[in-house]
Each structure stands twice: as structure tokens, then as C-alpha cells.
Swiss-Prot record:
Record-stated family: To A.pernix APE2001.
Protein keywords: DNA-binding, Endonuclease, Hydrolase, Nuclease, Restriction system
Molecular functions (GO terms): DNA binding; endonuclease activity
Pfam families: DUF2122
Matching InterPro entries: DUF2122_RecB-nuclease-rel
Source taxonomy: Archaea, Methanobacteriati, Methanobacteriota, Methanomada group, Methanococci
Catalytically driven reaction(s): Endonucleolytic cleavage of DNA to give specific double-stranded fragments with terminal 5'-phosphates
Record's protein name: Putative type II restriction enzyme MjaORF1200P
Keyword Nuclease: yes
Domain of life (superkingdom): Archaea
Biological process terms in GO annotation: DNA restriction-modification system
Length: 146
């Protein structure tokens, strides 16, 4: 699971960035990707995440857009984790591999249709629990595979 890229996309909250990092690094993810961060997420969330990563010997990659992350990282698959109203299929944790990019949307509105075309839209639970809840469940389920 260490090589998997975990991404927080479209966030404006510094606290969300910090908590996302705490959860991902807590599950021993080596590299967190952040795309389309604005407002306090970009101004104070990213620097806080960099500090956390440095102290833990982990990595942070920050891109302006999701397309940039896909271009640079060249993942085998891109999973966009959203809610059931926009994603048709439930996540099959067995289909997620080490060289995949797994993207969680920080905005309460979820992914746009254009963003969903960039990968495989999947949901984890029936109800909307947000990026942090989805991340925690996802990483817990993935950790059971090891």
C-alpha cells in the first residue's frame, strides 16, 4: 500500500488538508497528492502538510489540477471516490493496486462530470460522509488486504 498515491482534490479547508494527511500517514501512505487547493488550504494547509511529511519522512506533491497529477504520476488506474449519487459502482478493494491514484473530493459538491471522466467513479458507503470519512474507511479496508 505504500506506493499507492492518495489524493485530496478541490479543497479550500486547511484543517481538512491537515486531517487528510494525519489519516493517510497514519496508515503508512508514503505520498499524498493535493490538487486544486484554494483559500486557506493552499495558504496554510499545504505548508502544514509539508511540515508533517518532513517530520515523518513522507512525501507531498501539490499540483494545480488533477490532470497534472495524472500526467506526472502516470498511475495504472485512477479511482475517484465520491458518493452514490454520482458514482455508479461500489469500490471493489481488490481492484485497487499499488500504482493507482485514488482521489477523494474535498468539496461538499463532489466531483464534476468532467472530473469523473478522468477515472473510475466509485463510492464506499451509501450515505455522504465526506473525504475524511471515505479516506479512513478506504485505507482501513486496504490495510486488511496486506
Amino acid at each position: 500500500m505504500r506506493k499507492m498515491f492518495i489524493c485530496l482534490h478541490n479543497t479550500y479547508s486547511a484543517k481538512q488538508v491537515e486531517e487528510f494527511g494525519r489519516i493517510a500517514y497514519g496508515f503508512d501512505i508514503n505520498t499524498i497528492v493535493v490538487t486544486k487547493a484554494t483559500a486557506s488550504a493552499a495558504q496554510s494547509g499545504i505548508p502544514t502538510l509539508h511540515k508533517m511529511a518532513y517530520k515523518l519522512g513522507k512525501n507531498v506533491l501539490f499540483f494545480e489540477e488533477l490532470d497534472d497529477a495524472i500526467e506526472v504520476l502516470r498511475p495504472e488506474k485512477v479511482f475517484l471516490i465520491g458518493n452514490k449519487s454520482i458514482c455508479d459502482e461500489k469500490v471493489d478493494f481488490n481492484e485497487v493496486g499499488e500504482n493507482d491514484l485514488v482521489v477523494f473530493c474535498g468539496a461538499s459538491t463532489g466531483f464534476t462530470k468532467l472530473e469523473l471522466e478522468k477515472g473510475l467513479g466509485r463510492y464506499i458507503v451509501e450515505n455522504e460522509i465526506g473525504a475524511l470519512g471515505n479516506l479512513a474507511i478506504f485505507l482501513y479496508e486496504m490495510s486488511k488486504k496486506i
